[in-house]
Amino acid sequence: MLFSLRNFISYSNLYLYKNVCIGGQLLLNQDEILKKMEEWPKHYNPKEIEEKWQKIWLSEEYWRDVFRFRDEDDKAPRFVIDTPPPFTSGELHMGHAYWVTIADTIGRFKRLEGYNVLLPQGWDTQGLPTELKVQYKLGIPKDNRQLFLQKCIEWTEEMIKKMKEAMIRLGYRPEWERFEYKTYEPKYRKIIQKSLIDMYKMNLIEMREGPVIWCPKCETALAQSEVGYLEKEGILAYIKFPLKEGGEIVIATTRPELLAATQAIAVNPMDERYKNLVGKIALVPIFNIEVKIISDADVEKEFGTGAVMISTYGDPQDIKWQLKYNLPIKVIVDEKGRIINTNGILDGLKIEQARNKMIELLKTKGYLVKVEKIKHNVLSHVERSDCLSPVEFLVKKQIYIKVLDKKQKLLEEYKKMKFKPARMSYYLEDWIKSIEWDWNITRQRIYGTPLPFWYCENGHLVPAKEEDLPIDPIKTSPPLEKCPLCGSELKPVTDVADVWIDSSVTVLYLTKFYEDKNVFNRTFPASLRLQGTDIIRTWLFYTFFRTLMLANNVPFTTVLVNGQVLGPDGTRMSKSKGNVVSPLDRVNDFGADAIRMALLDASIGDDFPFKWDIVKGKKMLLQKLWNASRLVYPFIAKQRLDKPKSLHIVDKWILQEHKKFVTKAINAYENYDFYLVLQELYNYFWEIVADEYLEMIKHRLFDDDNSAKYTIQRIIRDIIILLHPIAPHITEEIYSRLFGHKKSVLLEELPKVDDIEENKRIDELGEVIKKTNSLIRSEKIKNRLSMNTPVSVKLYASKQVIELINEVKDDVMKTLKVTNLELIESNEEKVEIKTANQSMGV
């Protein structure tokens, strides 16, 4: 039921000129009350109010008194949140808006709960996407390394500015003043490099030569966590390999362009078709290379012909076989994805071109049996959605962090972290179990953290001096003239670090692991890691692994993993689908608070569609709260009302409902079930407080009834406090107008409800009130009468119900404009109404 101001204050001529004492002032009539209400705008203007409070929150005064993490405070419990440092793309998408809202909500709730909260915000600044923007959009060549780096930093700062403004517009208030960090800055870079040197000293880092995952499109090495299988269209070529002693064997391959790198043919030892061929020599067609036929249990008999070629390297299985059988290595793909070392047959061609040409050559020479078009899984660069290109395996000298021999320890230690939802722990466990490679941390890029090492031709590493950090080996002389192990000349490592090296030390940076052991001991492990499902195997795993190695403990006690925000059609947002929604598209129409509420309206960990209709519904709820606050404003504003010795029975009922709401809401917050907070708020505030209770107490408010005034003030204040973490702007505004005892809601405490007595009979009374009101309203609607039309009512109900109604008969009558209420005992509950003869209102 929508509030009407005039209906609220004119329910009866009896009260038209009633003197009402409000806040020490005498309001003589409804005109005075109307005038008082006009101090409060009728319509909630989210843009105006939100921008006002965002400016206030950013003031030095509010930072100092409300949002500052108090390093000196040894009494209050600490709550440290490790928030995601987003890559500085410049666009704050809906996924960013989601975790920003979650982080801000948790930070605000924990402050209300009495915690000393550290809510930081960093920026993951370095990496390939920025390089590509600078290289192609700005036209800056990579040849001039210094200029290129400078332009990358300028671009980064420009993007940070845009994203930060968008975050602030959504009401996000981390501690920008002291805990905003950028991964390219010297202070942070020093921590990165120090952590790498420490891991080197722990014998966890080494340089070695071998096959690496390589993205020809991005021209850099990759880690296992950055690749995955994508279904793509391809071919399966059936090729005849002549046998040296006569005869032939037909193999099936998806990579005929790698024939020149073939080192063996493999068949399954249980495959009767090829048992007599194992150990024989076959000739690679076109290239006439002699290779041995071997048997291996990993060959799938059902795939193709059951015979496969082993090349260096077509896929991860080729690498395993090469190591297992100590096969020769021949590299025929370069860093740009072009064919080399084929005696000019395919040299210079890109992979796809070489594949097509090889098919034609095999066909011409009579070696091609057939070609099938297939769909198959291809290992690709999936960590970057704007790449998704197939990867190759090149032989390179790279720097690795040893992970494989720590897998068992990792599988034991991860259980010390609590996951929300609990099922997310299995994603991390499965990833740890699936790791097959050590972590290649070198990237052949420019805009990244320099690896603080020099190396010699034998692959020995020499770390920088810690007092020289942060350093760039390209610009700095090595700490020694020669390699201390072999006496060879030292060269700087020119590659930069994997970007996950940067972001995997966020916890160590925030808790001052290297700077202040006292602070570290009081803030580590962090209380909470907040992140999405898509970076469990990267940011979560690498932070967990590195922190465990360096600090000998898990990085955080709880991991909160949110799902993905989908397009309105329920599919992943994509520009090609046209279903991309920006959080700022309609923020001025509906407000940041309504957007935040819509984003938190799903269970943590679940994917959900974002729809503006849901946002619109949330704004309606906020307008309802605004209206209710405005309506009670003349009666309770800025008053300190003590609990009366005796409460009206209707007030006792609503306080029992209030106790249930407060208890459920706080419990939901504690469990990060924000959707339950909103669900309980709607059920309690909209359906009970606004639609029932406010209607029932208005006559008592005009009577200056302390029980009604105390109760509604307590209810509104507690609702404001409990809604504040999710909808901070409107709650600050209402609080400042209605209460204002403190400069911010955040300086209040969570509501306490232990003093509210619980009585089963009063609960029953409440249910009877709601049902009776509903019956009378329904009859009025059925008879096309307005809610303000005076009526006579006959209510048929059981003896028990009648006894309860008699306790609140006067309240029911005044609430629903009932001039005469006749209670008739009956087994059937129903209502009969007729229009009253006398006027009941203005």
From Swiss-Prot:
Catalyzes the attachment of valine to tRNA(Val). As ValRS can inadvertently accommodate and process structurally similar amino acids such as threonine, to avoid such errors, it has a 'posttransfer' editing activity that hydrolyzes mischarged Thr-tRNA(Val) in a tRNA-dependent manner. The gene is valS. GO terms for molecular function: aminoacyl-tRNA deacylase activity; ATP binding; valine-tRNA ligase activity. InterPro entries: aa-tRNA-synth_I_CS (IPR001412), aa-tRNA-synth_Ia (IPR002300), Anticodon_Ia_Val (IPR033705), M/V/L/I-tRNA-synth_anticd-bd (IPR013155), Rossmann-like_a/b/a_fold (IPR014729), tRNAsynth_Ia_anticodon-bd (IPR009080), Val/Leu/Ile-tRNA-synth_edit (IPR009008), Valine-tRNA_ligase_type_2 (IPR022874). SUPFAM superfamilies: Anticodon-binding domain of a subclass of class I aminoacyl-tRNA synthetases (SSF47323), Nucleotidylyl transferase (SSF52374), ValRS/IleRS/LeuRS editing domain (SSF50677). The keyword DNA-binding does not apply. CDD domains: Anticodon_Ia_Val (cd07962), ValRS_core (cd00817). Disulfide bonds: none annotated. This is Valine--tRNA ligase. Keywords: Aminoacyl-tRNA synthetase, ATP-binding, Cytoplasm, Ligase, Nucleotide-binding, Protein biosynthesis.
